[in-house]
Amino acid sequence: MALSRLSSRSNIITRPFSAAFSRLISTDTTPITIETSLPFTAHLCDPPSRSVESSSQELLDFFRTMALMRRMEIAADSLYKAKLIRGFCHLYDGQEAVAIGMEAAITKKDAIITAYRDHCIFLGRGGSLHEVFSELMGRQAGCSKGKGGSMHFYKKESSFYGGHGIVGAQVPLGCGIAFAQKYNKEEAVTFALYGDGAANQGQLFEALNISALWDLPAILVCENNHYGMGTAEWRAAKSPSYYKRGDYVPGLKVDGMDAFAVKQACKFAKQHALEKGPIILEMDTYRYHGHSMSDPGSTYRTRDEISGVRQERDPIERIKKLVLSHDLATEKELKDMEKEIRKEVDDAIAKAKDCPMPEPSELFTNVYVKGFGTESFGPDRKEVKASLP
C-alpha cells in the first residue's frame, strides 16, 4: 500500500517526499495507542502510563528522522576517516530514540543542553544537514561558523545551548538556564543531558542540590550507554542506578532505545518540573561506535555484544516494525525512503564541501559581549594586530 503523507512540522528536517510518496491514502486522524517496550521504574514518584498516544504521521516521522540521523552519523564516520573532519568527533548512532522522543514531548521554548555527542540533538532542534556537515568540516556555513566543530554545535533560536567539551560541565549551565526560566516566569523547562561517565562529577550533585532547593524546572537526563571513554559503568560507579542518584529528587528509569518510552517520560518529566521542580531521567541506551573516532569500541566490549544489541534493541528497527504492523508502508517503500535519505545526505555533504572556510577575523567574534570586543579596543590592541590578513 502507498505510504501515508507526512504533515509539515516545525522541525525542518522533515523534507517533502517525492511524488511517489506523496499520495494521501487516508484521512483517518484516529490516534494510535502504543505500549512501551518495558515498564518505567520510578524513584520517589509514580511512573507514567505505558500507553502512549501517537499517530500514523508521528510514526512515519519518527522513522524518517531517525533514519536520517543514522545516515548522517555514518557519513560523518567516513568524512573523519577521509580527514575532512579534524579534531574530536563523537557519534550518536544507536541513541537516536533519545533525541527524537525528547523532541516529540517538548517545544522549542524548552531548552536543551548536552555534552559533545550533539549532532543528532542539533538536527532534532531544527538544524539542517548543511549546517551539520559545514560545521564538522570547519566551514563558514556551520552552525557555529566553523569554529566549534563536532563538540560545539549551537542553535540559540531553538533553545539549544550546545555542545560542551568539558565532562559534566553542561549540567550546572543547564540548571542556570532553568533558573532564568523560573525567574522570568516562563512556562518552559531545561533538559540537561549527560552520560554515565559524567554521572560521578561533583558539579552535577552541586547543581542538582541548588535546583532542588529552589524548585527549578530542570530535568537531568543521564544517557546511560553503559561505557565511558572505555570504562564499563560497573567499574566506575558503586551504584549505577543513576535515576536514584538524586536521593531527595524523583527519578525515572526509561528504555532509551524506545522512542515512545522516551517521549512519554519526557512529557511526564516536563509536567513534574513545571509543578514540583527537578527530576532525573535515566535513559538506558547504547552507542554502536566507540566513545570517539579514536576509540575502536571493541577493546572493552565484545563484537557479539554490539551485534546483539543491534539485533534485539535497535531503535530504528523497533519503529520500522510498528510502521509495518500498522500498515502505514511496505518494506519497499521504506527502502525507497532510505535511498532518498542517502541522496539528501550526499547532497548536503557536497554543498558543505563547496562552502568556504571562515575568514581569519572570525577568530575574534563571539568572544566578548557585543560592544566590548575588538571593535571597541582600537587598532593598537594586540588581539587586532594578531589577526591574519
From Swiss-Prot:
Enzyme Commission number(s) from the entry: 1.2.4.1
GO CC annotations, alphabetized: cytosol; mitochondrial matrix; mitochondrion; nucleus
Task: Quote the record's activity regulation.
Answer: E1 activity is regulated by phosphorylation (inactivation) and dephosphorylation (activation) of the alpha subunit.
Give first and last residue of the transit peptide: 1-32
Q: What is its main location?
A: mitochondrion
Reaction(s) this enzyme catalyzes, per UniProt = N(6)-[(R)-lipoyl]-L-lysyl-[protein] + pyruvate + H(+) = N(6)-[(R)-S(8)-acetyldihydrolipoyl]-L-lysyl-[protein] + CO2
Q: What induces it?
A: Induced by cadmium.
Q: Which EC class is this protein assigned?
A: oxidoreductase
Pfam families named among the record's database cross-references: E1_dh (PF00676)
Tissue specificity annotation:
Expressed in roots, rosettes and flowers.
- The answer to whether keyword Transit peptide applies is yes
Which cofactors does it use? thiamine diphosphate; Mg(2+)
Q: Which GO terms describe its biological process?
A: pyruvate decarboxylation to acetyl-CoA; response to cadmium ion
Record-listed thiamine diphosphate binding positions = 116-117, 165, 167, 196-198, 225, 291
Q: What does this protein do?
A: The pyruvate dehydrogenase complex catalyzes the overall conversion of pyruvate to acetyl-CoA and CO(2). It contains multiple copies of three enzymatic components: pyruvate dehydrogenase (E1), dihydrolipoamide acetyltransferase (E2) and lipoamide dehydrogenase (E3).
According to the record's subunit comment, the protein's assembly and interactions are: Tetramer of 2 alpha and 2 beta subunits.
Name of this protein: Pyruvate dehydrogenase E1 component subunit alpha-1, mitochondrial
